[in-house]
Amino acid sequence: DVKERSAVVRFKVKGEDAYILAWTTTPWTLPSNVALCVNPDEDYVKVTSKGYTYYMAAALVDTVLGEGAEVLEHYQGKDLEFKEYEPLFPYAEKRIGNKKAYYVVCDTYVTLTDGTGVVHIAPAFGEDDSKVGHRYDLPFVQLVNEKGEMTEETPWAGTFCKKADMAVLQALEDKDLLFDAPLFEHSYPHCWRCDTPLIYYARETWFIRMTAVKEDLIRNNNTINWIPESIGKGRFGDW
């Protein structure tokens, strides 16, 4: 388990003086954001607090906003589906293409255990995000290269993405879009050899239909003089 800065971010709603309040434990993925996700079956509210108007989960208002918040309207998550918002950053513009982006989607994987009941979606950097992205045909935006560094479209080109967290948070703060950046303790994968943080990273992959070549593999395996013999009959011969 590690303690890291999470981000509670204000996403400006299109055509309204209001924000969708969303949470993420990976601030470095925010430049690649293309959607926000709510749970279709949970209760959400439009609420005012300290001069701002927010959309968020009803159950988390007191935890996130504290006392004094005034609820204006009630919704089910599914009522917010397709509500549009303005992008946080312009860096993904060329990668969006003609696909629709920057709107609210729904999925039951969103929980109310932590955060705001709204999570940001970057399909290139998570299994749940990827599934939601495919279902809604969201654009694939990956502003991190295969070395794990932020790409040239961003101001942090060449920086290892995890080390870009604080710079991304500062950029949001400068835009008055960062509501909070609390420390959050969670399990995070690290390399077992060098203890470097790992990232979820979508990439093209080859898959081989082994049933089509199984008999050839067994026949060729039987021509090999394996020492010890059990390796050939076991690990390489057991199909």
Enumerate the language-model features and the residues they cover.
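Residue patterns forming the tRNA-binding/recognition surfaces of aminoacyl-tRNA synthetases
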Residues: 1-31, 84, 109, 113-239
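Catalytic alpha/beta core of large soluble enzyme barrels
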Residues: 32-146
